[in-house]
Regions:
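Activation segment of ePK-like protein kinases, specifically the conserved APE
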Residues: 106, 127-128, 146
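Catalytic-loop of the protein kinase fold
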Residues: 20-40
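Conserved hydrophobic alpha-helix
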Residues: 13-20
């Protein structure tokens, strides 16, 4: 897949996550397997979908599932309790998925490129060093000239 197609795929994923977060929904179970790509036969077109909302939680809801198994999920090491999950915890996972979409690899980009810096900021170990919103990631992605890969 071309670097530009990967970039388009990454942006579709980010717009989907921005849609959720702007409506007060945290996914809480992001993994490589929960990002689906539908390709259209006979064309270069594709559609990215985020799936598996079994652990998703709306802001302000007292209902939460805390004992569920999160097989394959990318779990934020800064998260003290699943009950305290916030958008910034999804952003940690977003960094890893964004990296995978753009490079095809699970190892995080550390090359100092603009896109590498975006990925590093998403997946910073300290949540205070991360993007505050998915929209902020989208804005920085728009400024990045060329995708990695």
């Amino acid at each position: 897949m071309s670097p530009w197609a990967r970039r388009k795929m990454a942006m579709q994923f980010l717009y989907a996550m921005n849609f959720l977060h702007r409506r007060g929904v945290c996914h809480r179970d992001l993994s490589y397997r929960n990002v689906l790509v539908h390709t259209y036969r006979g064309s270069d077109a594709f559609m990215v979908k985020v799936s598996d909302f079994g652990l998703a939680k709306e802001r302000g809801s007292d209902l939460t599932s805390t004992g569920s198994s999160m097989k394959g999920s990318i779990i934020d090491p800064a998260l003290k309790s699943f009950r305290d999950f916030k958008p910034v915890n999804d952003i940690y996972s977003i960094g890893f998925i964004l990296n995978y979409i753009l490079t095809g690899k699970e190892n995080l980009v550390t090359d100092g490129s603009r896109l590498g810096s975006i990925i590093q900021k998403c997946s910073a170990t300290n949540s205070a060093d991360r993007y505050r919103t998915v929209w902020d990631i989208i804005e920085d992605m728009r400024k990045a000239e060329c995708p990695v890969g």
